[in-house]
């Protein structure tokens, strides 16, 4: 399956860095340079996704990606800038990655502190 060029949207992948403070709380930052990628981004829908994510479904995006910059087991919880600029905090987080022979299905969850 090939993704149509006209359906692809430019987004930016930001790899996360996790450190801990004195009280062992996680501090997530995105210090690395953003990586430009093109993917098909759509609103998440469907019965299966509704059963998995429930009321969070309205904050989810379903994406299709072809390439090697996002990989299953490596990029979960990294940030994606969909509606914000590449120099801002990511507005979405990678929730899951499913690898198929010709593409990857990626579920994004909107960060709580963002709108859209």
Identify the meaning behind each predicted range.
Residues 1-28:
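Active-site-proximal polar cores
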Residues 27-116:
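Short, conserved turn/kink motifs that form compact alpha/beta structural patches or helix kinks used as
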